[in-house]
């Protein structure tokens, strides 16, 4: 259940729809990183990485902390819980449907 004030699940889906943002989320899953470290893992410029991070920040997937002149980013994976729950529901739905189809095809060759 989303918490009060949390961006809706569609925002999280939109944020992770872009391949660069998925790369950033994957990189941050390994721990906090600076923009320069994240840019090295991507095929886009540092300013583009910063723009993608702003989208992720906007939906609460990442937060930013300044350490001197460096900005470090932290992943908040709990924001993906609603996405994971929704995908699990679909997985169960389609799993059940495909199981029934398989049984039907075995019984009616």
Language-model-detected regions and their locations in the chain:
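Short, charged, intrinsically disordered terminal tails
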Residues: 5-7, 99-109
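C-terminal structural segments of small proteins and small subunits
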Residues: 80-104
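Intrinsically disordered, low-complexity proline-rich regions
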Residues: 35, 59-60, 109
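Beta-hairpin "wing" of winged helix-turn-helix
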Residues: 57-74
């Amino acid at each position: 259940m989303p918490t009060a004030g949390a961006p809706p699940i569609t925002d999280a889906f939109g944020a992770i729809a872009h391949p660069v943002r998925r790369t950033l989320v994957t990189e941050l899953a390994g721990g906090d990183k600076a923009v320069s470290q994240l840019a090295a893992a991507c095929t886009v410029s540092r300013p583009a990485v910063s723009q993608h991070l702003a989208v992720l920040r906007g939906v609460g997937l990442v937060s930013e902390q300044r350490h001197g002149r460096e900005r470090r980013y932290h992943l908040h994976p709990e924001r993906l819980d609603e996405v994971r729950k929704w995908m699990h529901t679909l997985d169960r739905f389609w799993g059940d449907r495909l199981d029934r189809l398989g049984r039907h095809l075995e019984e009616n060759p």
